[in-house]
């Protein structure tokens, strides 16, 4: 049995980024979107990065999620080398808590956009990739709508519990 061709490439500059990027992988798995996952360093494996980005479209990918910390050149360089949408995930660093990564990814020159999520928020990167794919896939669109409905239900359930308990008891329950 052949597994479906990956639609989303999830790449990161280092294996230390994997704990962050795992959330994007999990979201794609939850929505049954096939992925490929790779460690590709813009600085340590530049030729590999170029080859990956330039062949992504021909290999069937539709979106690339790229996570990086520090100088965080991976998302922008990949975006410069591929016609596909690139979603950048700034990975939190010890020195500047990921602000350096965020600025590096979000400050792209005109014509080479990188959609950028919050520091460490690979889950939203995965959700954005799924939503982009859902714009041309009615089955996936239905799954996204169901997911959004589940978020609404969760908030309404919390509101009902807050009303039932009152704010003090609600906070006490959360702190246990």
Curated annotation (Swiss-Prot):
GO molecular function terms attached to this record: 5-(carboxyamino)imidazole ribonucleotide mutase activity
Catalytic activity: 5-carboxyamino-1-(5-phospho-D-ribosyl)imidazole + H(+) = 5-amino-1-(5-phospho-D-ribosyl)imidazole-4-carboxylate
Isomerase recorded as keyword: yes
GO terms classed as biological process: 'de novo' IMP biosynthetic process
Pathway assigned to this chain's UniProt record: Purine metabolism; IMP biosynthesis via de novo pathway; 5-amino-1-(5-phospho-D-ribosyl)imidazole-4-carboxylate from 5-amino-1-(5-phospho-D-ribosyl)imidazole (N5-CAIR route): step 2/2
Residues at which substrate binds: 14, 17, 44
EC number(s) on file: 5.4.99.18
Keyword vocabulary terms for this entry: Isomerase, Purine biosynthesis
Coiled coil: none
Entry similarity comment: Belongs to the AIR carboxylase family. Class I subfamily.
Entry function: Catalyzes the conversion of N5-carboxyaminoimidazole ribonucleotide (N5-CAIR) to 4-carboxy-5-aminoimidazole ribonucleotide (CAIR).
PANTHER family in UniProt: PHOSPHORIBOSYLAMINOIMIDAZOLE CARBOXYLASE, PHOSPHORIBOSYLAMINOIMIDAZOLE CARBOXYLASE CATALYTIC SUBUNIT
NCBIfam families given in the database record: purE
Protein name in the entry: N5-carboxyaminoimidazole ribonucleotide mutase
Lineage of origin: Bacteria, Bacillati, Cyanobacteriota, Cyanophyceae, Synechococcales
Annotated gene: purE
